[in-house]
Amino acid sequence: MAREMRLGGKERMKTGVVKIGLVAALGVVGLISAGGVYAGQPRVISTIQTGATWEPLGREEPLTVPEVHFRVKHSPFKSELVRYGQFQFNDAAWSLQGSYSCASCHYERGQTTGLIWDLGDEGWGSWKNTKYIRGGRYLPPFRHEGFTGHPDEIVGATSSLDRVCGRDPGFVFRSENFSPMRLEALICYIRALEFTGSPFRNADGSLTEAQKRGQKIFEDPKVGCLECHPGDPMDPRALFSDAQTHDVGTGRVGVNGFRSTPGKVFNISALEAGEDPYGVESNTPIIGLDLVKEFDTPTLRDIYASGTYFHDGGARTLMDTINNTVNDKDMHGRTSHLKQQELQDLVEYLKAL
């Protein structure tokens, strides 16, 4: 099944709306005729492959990059649409007072600043780590909580992107919603972002000796990494995720109640008094991520470049994700019995993915 976005007739863009600088930036000079951009008969400018309602794969089925997940077929405008999406991704004009763009957080073509944000969309105090979105089209859902499923939910008026980045002064302060064309172009650009590949392997792509030792630890059933992150490091299509949500001990509401080190919550009275609004520790959960214990299993591809880690950015380094200093003991892999050198070898293997 394919959904086609067409421009033409009543939907075509008039030349008076398009600024010369934007046209030049998009590389679409020459596509403009006397009637408008893409004037004349409707033309297919994007074809997105869709299917039945997306369902998480079973753990016995390693998740891999689909052979054909997204493609623009028989379209002379693919590159222009992606480049227009890149313009939108880096353009702050659509936000309130031009304060920031997508690239402000997902900089350098979809990578992450590693910063943690409290955007207030799920209750003050719901810290969220900036997600690494390269290769994101291969691995829904698109939020830490796993609330969105099908890859194409990210497209459309009720999509996760339009909802998460919607016309809401409590989130990214966008002054208006994206038009269908702008949203489609943005999605095409995001879908075009591929994994970078690890620079930590040998020159021929093979694993170093430390990485080989780390692989044995990673695949050891006693450690359990493969239970949630299945994949072969020599398979370029492997994603190292079971596409499920799990409780790895990072939620504030733990198995036996509150965690021993609950986070700081927003205090409006302190803010009004000119004090640090997050200066007070509290055992009282609030709406949003504080009431969630299970979070989406991320891909381990490009994991070296996607820190900080966990949904709240609680782990600054890869070592912090496995040495039981951030999450509850042995809830994120069973690593408490490993020696320091074994932990370091495991980190080296992760950096190779």
Curated annotation (Swiss-Prot):
Q: Its annotated pathway?
A: Nitrogen metabolism
Q: Which residues bind heme c 1?
A: C102, C105, H106, C165
Tell me which stretches of the chain form a coiled coil. none
Identify one Gene Ontology CC term for this UniProt entry: anammoxosome
Q: Which residues form the Cytochrome c domain?
A: 209-353
Task: Specify the domain of life of the species encoding this protein.
Answer: Bacteria
Which stretch is the leader sequence? 1-39
Keyword Acyltransferase on entry: no
Query: What molecular function terms (GO) are annotated for this protein?
Result: cytochrome-c peroxidase activity; electron transfer activity; heme binding; metal ion binding
Q: Where does Ca(2+) 2 bind?
A: N129, S306, G307, T308
Q: What induces it?
A: Is among the most highly expressed proteins in the proteome.
Write down the Gene3D superfamilies for this protein, in alphabetical order: Cytochrome c-like domain
Cell location: Anammoxosome
The alphabetized UniProt keywords are:
Calcium, Heme, Iron, Metal-binding, Oxidoreductase, Signal
- Subunit and interaction comment: Part of the hydrazine synthase complex that forms an elongated dimer of heterotrimers composed of one alpha, one beta and one gamma subunit.
Q: What name has this protein been given in UniProt? A: Hydrazine synthase subunit gamma
Which organism's genome codes for this protein?
Kuenenia stuttgartiensis
Task: Supply the source organism's classification.
Answer: Bacteria, Pseudomonadati, Planctomycetota, Candidatus Brocadiia, Candidatus Brocadiales
